[in-house]
Each structure stands twice: as structure tokens, then as C-alpha cells.
Amino acid sequence: MMTYEYILVRYGEMTTKGKNRSKFVSTLKDNVKFKLKKFPNIKIDATHDRMYIQLNGEDHEAVSERLKDVFGIHKFNLAMKVPSELEDIKKGALAAFLQVKGDVKTFKITVHRSYKHFPMRTMELLPEIGGHILENTEDITVDVHNPDVNVRVEIRSGYSYIMCDERMGAGGLPVGVGGKVMVLLSGGIDSPVAAYLTMKRGVSVEAVHFHSPPFTSERAKQKVIDLAQELTKYCKRVTLHLVPFTEVQKTINKEIPSSYSMTVMRRMMMRITERIAEERNALAITTGESLGQVASQTLDSMHTINEVTNYPIIRPLITMDKLEIIKIAEEIGTYDISIRPYEDCCTVFTPASPATKPKREKANRFEAKYDFTPLIDEAVANKETMVLQTVEVVAEEEKFEELF
């Protein structure tokens, strides 16, 4: 029985790139190799237009499951490779068709003759290949407009690829081509989705989480670690910075009027994150803010909070409503972690009536009454940093270490 020997990867948005396209292709190849570390027999060949993954006996379903989370891949096809002879092509097309799962009633044949010296033209090949499938199946018909299965045949010099099973990739651009940002990872539903969407644009992320023991628990801290771990499905690794925020929050609660405490808290977070971004050579800050969702996410609040940093603030969720955000969170695997009932620092000392239209002038006047600089320095100096990698990669490294 013939089996899938290759996976053909299509780039999608990367095809619009010009002179730097080779950088995008190289980064994608590197990301795919990292993602498929568990499969030692595969070989990867990345050309200008697509990528060829030779399976060499590896499980195509297991490989496909990992490929679907790699940004930069538009679609990929499971493919069989056969000699460019009519009978081999017909047999390969039938074998590929028979491996398609589900309720299949209709099909069509698509032929692309890259090898123009092949003795038969496309219009001659279509009935030959389609007829062979019809002769060897039951209750199957041809539908050229809306088929259940499109049997694609690419004819080249010496060999041809046969493809039926087409799957969607994650889209976007390869993580690593767009620089690095610091993402504020709160532990809620929104910020992991913001991190995911930022990575989808080819940007590497490092996460900053503010925790305030004893007001926030170790379980709340572990929840954020688990969220960062879940995000490693979409990149090589996530560096997480855990910032002690207790003294800053206690001082804000004591020195700042309650209506402005939330605004000042967010401004302090931005100042600390900017300091870490400078240390880590990040170029922007990403947040999970959605316009109008809570008091700190009005335009007035954002205008006042933005004042304290010169870094660009990326807000991927800014126009989304909560249901749209939840839908993505469920799809990427972060929702169930985010709804664990452990409070983060944003719920500590929550004011009864936070200002929804805070002014920069007032925020500056309130902050000027107390020197927060030593507290900011202390928070940055005492941060805990950990590097999280895909679970499979960690397991492989531990297995390797056990050998010595």
C-alpha cells in the first residue's frame, strides 16, 4: 500500500516579500526544524516558493499536528511521490484518494505540468486519471465546481507529486523576522491571546508578569507559568519575567487617591516593563487591552498611561469584543488555564470608583508627591526570569542528559 512520503508546505503571505524573502524562508525552515525535533528521520528542503518535508517513515499525522501551529505556513499537503509515468500517476492518484477520511462522494482532478516535455497534455491527463479512480471506486462522481476532494497532480521531470489531503496552517509570518516585544501577561483571558496574535506577525515575545505576594498566591503565579508554557506551542521558547510588585502596590494604595490608583498602577507597570525591554533589546510593549472593556481601557486611560513610555504600545485586541477574544483563547488552548480562579495583582486594592477619564496632569501631580524610583529599581532588580520551551523539546533534553 502506498503511503504519504512528503509534506509540501505553501508559504502564503511570505510570497509578497521581495529582496528579504530568503530571510523569511530561512527563519521558517529553522522554526519548522525546531518544531519537528522529535522526528529524527525527516529532511527539510526550503525553496523560494515552498518547503518540502521528506518523512522517511515518520508518522505523517504526528508531523502534521505540529506543523499546524507554525506561523508562516499558509497551507500544507500530504503528498505521494511517484515516477512521471502515466500508470504510476494513475495508481498514485487512486491510492491518495482512498486515504482521504470522511464521507467522500465527489472529486475532481487538477494537473499542473511543470515538466512541459511530458508526452500528454493536461486535458488528456484529466480523463485518464479521473477514469482510473471511477473504475476502482463505488458511488463516487466527478464534480469540477465543488468537489469533496481535489486530487492534485504536479508533474515534474522524472517524478510527480500526488496530493489530496490539504490542511490549513497557522498563517502569518515566521516568528523571529519582526524583532522582539515584551508582553504584559496578567493571567487573564486577554493577554495570552494578545501574545499569540503578536507572534502571528512574526514577532518574538518575552512575557512580564507582576505578582504581589502574599496578596496573590503561588497558584496564581503557576497559572501564568502554565500560560507561558502553552504559548510555546507557537514559537521556540518564551522567556517569562516574574516581577515582585507588592511594595509598589502598597505604596500606591497609601499615597495615591483611590480613583487614580489603577491608572498609576498601570503607569508603574509600563515604567518597569520599559526598563526590562531596554535590558532585553525589545522594541515594543504588547498588552491585552480591549477598548472600553474596563475602566483602565478607555481612550482617556490609555492616553494617560502611555505618557510614561516612549516605546510603541501594541494592542492586538483593541477592537475585539469579549466573545471574539474568548473564541481565539479556546482555539489556542489558553482559555481553560486563564479561567482558573486565582486572582492576579490587578485585583489587589481594587478601587470602588476608578477614574474612567484620568488626566495626565493629575496623574503626574499625584506621582510627584512620592519618589517611586527606588521601588521601580527594586522591582526590576528582584525579578525572577525563566525560559520555557515546548514540552517535547524539554523531554528530549532531559532524556539526553540522563545518558551522561
Swiss-Prot record:
Primary location: cytoplasm
Pathway(s) served: Cofactor biosynthesis; thiamine diphosphate biosynthesis
UniProt KW keywords: ATP-binding, Cytoplasm, Nucleotide-binding, RNA-binding, Thiamine biosynthesis, Transferase, tRNA-binding
Coiled coil feature spans: none
Domain of life the protein comes from: Bacteria
SUPFAM superfamilies per the UniProt record, alphabetical: Adenine nucleotide alpha hydrolases-like, THUMP domain-like
Domain called THUMP: residue spans: 61-166
Compartments in which it is found: Cytoplasm
Pfam families reported for this sequence: ThiI, ThiI_fer, THUMP
Catalytic activity reported: [ThiI sulfur-carrier protein]-S-sulfanyl-L-cysteine + a uridine in tRNA + 2 reduced [2Fe-2S]-[ferredoxin] + ATP + H(+) = [ThiI sulfur-carrier protein]-L-cysteine + a 4-thiouridine in tRNA + 2 oxidized [2Fe-2S]-[ferredoxin] + AMP + diphosphate; [ThiS sulfur-carrier protein]-C-terminal Gly-Gly-AMP + S-sulfanyl-L-cysteinyl-[cysteine desulfurase] + AH2 = [ThiS sulfur-carrier protein]-C-terminal-Gly-aminoethanethioate + L-cysteinyl-[cysteine desulfurase] + A + AMP + 2 H(+)
CDD domains reported in the protein's UniProt record: PPase_ThiI (cd01712), THUMP_ThiI (cd11716)
EC number: 2.8.1.4
GO cellular component: cytosol
Example GO BP: thiazole biosynthetic process
Positions annotated to bind ATP: L184, L185, H209, F210, R266, G288, Q297
Entries under HAMAP family matching the protein: ThiI
Function: Catalyzes the ATP-dependent transfer of a sulfur to tRNA to produce 4-thiouridine in position 8 of tRNAs, which functions as a near-UV photosensor. Also catalyzes the transfer of sulfur to the sulfur carrier protein ThiS, forming ThiS-thiocarboxylate. This is a step in the synthesis of thiazole, in the thiamine biosynthesis pathway. The sulfur is donated as persulfide by IscS.
Family statement drawn from the similarity comment of this UniProt entry: Belongs to the ThiI family.
Designated name of the protein: Probable tRNA sulfurtransferase
